[in-house]
């Protein structure tokens, strides 16, 4: 970024705001969110299948957070689905027009874990670049569940693996569901060590790689959080367990 190699330590943001049920609409609230994130070393937010309100970008400009927005899709892209395609393209161009001047708005993806017509995805990204070439564009986050590897036409690759390969040689995160990788991946099937890294996997991509949803593993709940649920979301699951 601006000539400097930049390491992203990211936050998966799925628009989860338990007290209100919607994202904050003011800069002050978002600054507090980002300041908390920064205290954990986070400098990048990936918005899962949504674009946050303008206040979020304004706050990110101040706090130095890089934003990846996404179109609201978790599914498949097909040239035959005209209504969906028209909706998504309208959303994309409005996002670029209304949010594009914010320096924190660095990346835009087509959605989450998409499948479908890559040529159509590539055509859309070409249109976005022609409309506004200030941003980086991707086909989506973890498209084809990583099995497709690096595909020409996108500026960066967000994925859990860089294509298929023997063992865990293409993995760029440690934890997998047992249906997605042998015995649940590196975290679940190897001994703790300080020698494993993702150098070989990253080398298989000709463009920058962002590891997709790295924190997918079980944790024991903190029952002290029960008292914090004073808004629209009720923690029935925590009460049961």
What are these regions (language model features)?
Residues 1-37:
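N-terminal carbohydrate-binding accessory modules
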Residues 6, 40, 103:
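Structured loop/turn residues at beta-strand edges in well-structured enzyme cores
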Residues 10, 23, 29, 39, ...:
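Small-side-chain structural scaffolding
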Residues 29-48, 52-53:
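Catalytic domains of carbohydrate-active enzymes, especially glycoside hydrolases
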Residues 44-241:
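Substrate-binding/catalytic cleft of secreted carbohydrate-active enzymes
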């Amino acid at each position: 970024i601006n000539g400097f190699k930049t390491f992203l330590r990211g936050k998966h943001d799925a628009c989860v705001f338990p007290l209100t049920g919607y994202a904050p609409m003011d800069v002050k609230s978002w600054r507090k969110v980002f300041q908390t994130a920064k205290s954990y070393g986070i400098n990048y937010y990936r918005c899962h299948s949504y674009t946050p309100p303008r206040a979020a970008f304004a706050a990110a400009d101040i706090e130095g957070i890089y934003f990846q927005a996404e179109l609201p899709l978790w599914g498949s892209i097909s040239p035959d689905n005209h209504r969906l395609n028209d909706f998504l393209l309208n959303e994309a161009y409005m996002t670029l027009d209304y949010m594009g001047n914010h320096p924190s708005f660095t990346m835009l993806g087509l959605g989450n874990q998409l499948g479908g017509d890559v040529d159509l995805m590539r055509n859309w990204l070409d249109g976005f670049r022609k409309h506004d070439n200030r941003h980086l564009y991707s086909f989506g986050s973890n498209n084809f569940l990583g099995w497709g590897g690096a595909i020409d036409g996108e500026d960066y690759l967000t994925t859990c693996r860089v294509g298929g390969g023997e063992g865990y040689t293409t993995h760029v995160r440690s934890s997998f569901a047992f249906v997605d990788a042998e015995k649940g991946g590196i975290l679940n099937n190897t001994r703790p060590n300080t020698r494993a890294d993702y150098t070989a996997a990253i080398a298989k991509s000709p463009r920058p790689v962002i590891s997709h949803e790295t924190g997918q593993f079980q944790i024991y709940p903190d029952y002290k959080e029960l008292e914090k649920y004073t808004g629209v979301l009720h923690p029935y699951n925590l009460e049961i367990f």
